[in-house]
Each structure stands twice: as structure tokens, then as C-alpha cells.
Amino acid sequence: GRLLADRRVEVITDDQTETVVGEHGILAAGSVPFTIPGVDIDNKYIVDNEGALAFGETPKKLGVIGAGVIGLELGSVWRRLGAEVTLFEAADTFLPVVDQDMSKAAAREFKKQGLDIRLGTKVSAAKVSRSKVKVTYSDGDQEHDATFDRLLVAVGRRAASENLLCADSGVELTERGQVDVNDQCQTSVPQVWAIGDLVRGPMLAHKASEEGIAVAETIAGHHGHFNLDTVPWVIYTDPEIAWVGRTENDLKAAGIDYRSGSFPFAATGRGLAMGDAAG
């Protein structure tokens, strides 16, 4: 469906189209994977994150484009299941959104686990031939080829705002294609709200849930409260990576005075019980 003017929603099914009207409307269409030129996803040999959950067997060699959250989560799972995993990351910095002490520690652990993370590499093409995927990539001025049994494209996700709004809906989008909202998740149209992956902030399910609760409370006449700065971020790798609030780099960039401290994971109760010193 899509949003029309005056809080009307056009609902399209296989056999009919109807229009419904509401006093309030909440946009929660989620997100879709990014694609890159020269790499066509068939979800058999070249897959997105959903396709990477449907392999019939463990690939001997798995290539991953993108060493961000999705690439690391799925890449590390298939590594633990026995695949040789190579991750191509265009950025020169590993996990730049994460506190740098944490990202450095995580990079060391992933290397020990056998993940081959290649920073500063850009994939320009991927072709399927004889049940293999040939990947062409560059690192600086040098171009290389690599062959894999499967290739996962994990270069992030974007708001699913395409075809969501008609021209006269009145709802505005940002330059990134997200629905533009204020701190209360209200759009440019009164009584129309947007939450989750459609709007600014991390694309996390619990963030969308909190936004939905806050919007429902506001619609009901209560004080809906949501603070984007206190949303926990998490990357489901082993070891897990998680944080709440601003990172040290964020504080430095904002010119905010701060104190920092650290505590080794090996000295925590969980670390001692599991015999795990990483972190």
C-alpha cells in the first residue's frame, strides 16, 4: 500500500484496491538491502542476508561484501560452521561507529577465529560460472580476482520508502530516502508518524519497538518518551559487541569533556565462569 493525502491509505491486494482513512497513521515499512552495481543477487550463489540463512550446506569458501554488522554476524556464524570466510570492506577503518578500543579488540578476536577481513577493498564485479562465484576487487591501484562457492552481499540496508508515499501525501523524505521526523517521530503531516528502519537512528528491532510505544502513548494523549541517545546497540558476534550512548570519538568531535575507564571481561563473573578472556 501507500499513503495518500489526508491520512488516506491505498491498500492493494491481488484482486482489488481499496482506500482506508484513519485519524492517525503510523508508517513502519522497514528496510530493504542495498545493492551494488556489477553484483546481481540471485539468492542461490550470490545472496543477501536472507539467502545466507538458507544454504543447504556449509560452503567451503564464502565471500562477504561488507564487514559491518550483518556481514560480521553471518560471516562469523558460517566460519564457526566450517567455512573459509573472506570479508571485503571498502572503508579503511574497521567498525568506525564502534568505540575504537572495542573495535580493535574485536578485530583481534575475529582474526584468531580465522575471519579474513580485508579493509580498503572495493568489489567491482561478481559473476557466477560453473557453480562458483568469481569476484573482482581492488585494493588501491591493484585489481584482483577471487573465487568462492557462495557470495553474501551485506553492504547495509536502506529505508523502504520507495513507492510508499504518493506525491500529494505531504510527508517529506530526507536526502537519504528516510522519512523525516522530529524527536517524537512525527512527520511533516500532523497525525502521521513514522518509526523503525524508515527513520533516523540505528536499524534495530528494539529501537523500533520503543518508538512504536512512544507514538502509541502520544496518540493516546500521554507523554510518549523516546531518547535516541540511550538506545543499546548490539552486534551478535562471538564475542558480542554492544554499547549504549556516545562513543569516545563522538564526545571528542562534540568537544565534550569526559572521563574514560575500562574493565577486563576476563575478570567478570561471566568471563570467569566461561573461561573467556576476550573483551
What are these regions (language model features)?
Residues A29-E84, F88, Q113-I117, A167-Q184, ...:
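Glycine-rich dinucleotide-binding loop and its adjacent helix/turn
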Residues D42-T58, T147-I219, H225-F226:
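FAD-site-proximal beta/loop scaffold in flavoenzymes
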Residues D15-H24, D141-R150, S188:
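Core beta-strand elements of the Rossmann-like FAD/NAD(P) dinucleotide-binding domain
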Residues I36-G38, L74, V128, E162-L164, ...:
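Short glycine-/acidic-enriched loop or helix-start segments at secondary-structure transitions
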Residues R2-E10, L81-D183, R246, A253-R259, ...:
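A Rossmann-like FAD-binding core segment of flavoenzymes
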Residues D99-D101, K112, V123-A125, A160, ...:
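Mid-to-C-terminal Rossmann-like scaffold of FAD/NAD(P)H-dependent oxidoreductases
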Residues R2-I26:
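Conserved redox-cofactor binding core of oxidoreductases
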